[in-house]
Amino acid sequence: YWVHMDKIRPAVVLTRDVALPYLSNITVAPIFTKVRGLRTEVIVDERNGLDHESAVNLDNVQTVSRDSVFDQIGLLTFRQKRELAWAIVLAFDLEIRLRDI
């Protein structure tokens, strides 16, 4: 999705789909063009509707107004969703083993 944050940028919506119509705020992970190779990043690219390789950054999760989120760009693959789950575990320092997710 495109999201109004510090500027209009792509982001992954982390809030579950079923809750979206009922919430005034939505949690998102911004996508940055700079890929730093961190374990708290998930690589996305043209397959996901972007112009070039970028990184979903789970160290910068934000909650924004639902009105700030617009125009779906693309979808994550199953593998990227698993990587996203693991990046969340690492970013929030959760005590979960990889095989548990």
Stretch-by-stretch model annotation:
Residues 1-3:
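Short coil-to-beta transition motif at edge beta-strands of beta-rich domains
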